[in-house]
């Protein structure tokens, strides 16, 4: 029981590591909270610190979720779903004890959790993400739409045995929780999208005709 508690705490602490914030401060002498959206996640890192830093933060944030999800397997723990460990990593990422309980928007770390538990489901979401990104040129919208399609996937796919072969109540609950976290963390982005002033990536069709301020 003690090892389970320690690993649950470790999952939160692992997720709480603010790689974007630390990389910005150590290597670029910049506090991401003072630039762009003020967020310490992958997207703001790309915009403020550049491609190399953005890729590094994305990989680290993704692996936080994956490693936390795999902790029960690594330590041969039974009786507690790996998804619980993954969810704690996402909570750590969004409410980091190392960053005054601030954090990212949970997309990369949530993707890492899904990667550790159901890689093909993540692949399905990645296709949705890339398609929406190309059509609308917005990472925020792509993230929210992928979260919505994750909810649709857990409802529909088990009926056809496609990707998800059967209904898994806990997986459905965790996916629901992750989707809600992602959508909630993007509420300011959704307001900007509504006002046609959301930040864009430098490619894609920008079908909604956003104009960055």
Swiss-Prot record:
It is found in: Cell membrane. It catalyses: an acyl phosphate + sn-glycerol 3-phosphate = a 1-acyl-sn-glycero-3-phosphate + phosphate. GO terms for cellular component: plasma membrane. SMART domains: G3P_acyltransf. Coiled coil: none annotated. The keyword Cell division does not apply. One of its GO terms (biological process) is phospholipid biosynthetic process. Keywords: Cell membrane, Lipid biosynthesis, Lipid metabolism, Membrane, Phospholipid biosynthesis, Phospholipid metabolism, Transferase, Transmembrane, Transmembrane helix. The chain crosses the membrane at residues 3-23, 48-68, 71-91, 119-139, 144-164, 165-185. InterPro entries: G3P_acylTferase_PlsY. Catalyzes the transfer of an acyl group from acyl-phosphate (acyl-PO(4)) to glycerol-3-phosphate (G3P) to form lysophosphatidic acid (LPA). This enzyme utilizes acyl-phosphate as fatty acyl donor, but not acyl-CoA or acyl-ACP. This is Glycerol-3-phosphate acyltransferase. The gene is plsY.
């Amino acid at each position: 029981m003690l090892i389970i508690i320690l690993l649950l705490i470790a999952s939160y602490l692992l997720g709480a590591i603010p790689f974007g914030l630390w990389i910005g401060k150590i290597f670029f002498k910049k506090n991401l909270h003072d630039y762009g959206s003020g967020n310490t996640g992958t997207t703001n890192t790309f915009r403020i610190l550049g491609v190399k830093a953005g890729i590094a933060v994305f990989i680290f944030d993704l692996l936080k979720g994956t490693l936390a999800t795999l902790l029960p397997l690594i330590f041969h723990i039974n009786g507690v779903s790996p998804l619980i460990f993954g969810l704690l990593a996402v909570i750590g990422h969004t409410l980091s004890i190392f960053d005054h309980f601030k954090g990212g928007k949970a997309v990369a770390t949530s993707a890492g959790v899904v990667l550790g538990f159901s890689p093909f489901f993540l692949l399905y979401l990645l296709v949705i993400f890339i398609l929406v990104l190309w059509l609308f040129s917005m990472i925020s919208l792509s993230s929210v739409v992928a979260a919505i399609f994750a909810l649709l996937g857990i409802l529909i796919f088990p009926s056809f045995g496609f990707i998800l072969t059967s209904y898994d109540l806990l997986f459905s609950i965790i996916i629901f929780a992750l989707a809600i976290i992602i959508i909630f963390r993007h509420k300011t982005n959704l307001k900007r999208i509504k006002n046609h002033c959301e930040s864009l990536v430098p490619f894609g069709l920008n079908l909604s005709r956003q104009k960055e301020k």
